Amino acid sequence: LRFEMLSLPELDLDAVDLRCTLLGKTLRGPLLIGAMTGGSTEAGQVNRILAAAAERCQVGFCLGSQRPMLDLQPQAVASFSLRDVAPSTLLLGNIGAVQLRDSLGARQLQALAQAVGADGMYVHLNPLQEAVQPEGDRDWRGVFDALRQAAEQVQIPLLVKEVGAGLGPQTLAQLAQLPIAGVETAGVGGTS
């Protein structure tokens, strides 16, 4: 995406209103601080700073993968508990698609969201990242069916994202078949 510079805009820039509504929350502009980290004390400190910034700037915030919460580690839960610093922020939880298939049903997915006060949940797709990690999840069979089942049963908005390789046309066509609230298209390039 490239923007063309318009040096003679013929408008009052102070009159431009970028506010939008996403999942029932009003944002100052169509911006979301993307998922980066979570699970450890240090990650919790980063999340708190970012969530407070999201609150101050009135933009959304997406948690890093909540996979560490599945082990019920106290520091993991604490690192994702941010409502005290971001009470009105659009807050989105996040779990991997393989974890959805292997460990979670709709009720557990909803419980993950409720545990952190999330307004919705992302399910992240990352087969390329997993393929190059020695300990990565290499079996992706049944992930689409698990995603479909969760989307049909969960009582919170469900969104899908890719963590660094983007969503191709075939994947988007598959996702269009599901009753999900949306997809994040910022996947190419990760958090850069």
Question: Model-predicted segments: where are they?
Answer:
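A gly/proline- and charged-residue-enriched helix-loop-helix capping module
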Residues: 56-97
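Residues that cap or initiate secondary-structure elements
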Residues: 7-9, 39, 67, 99
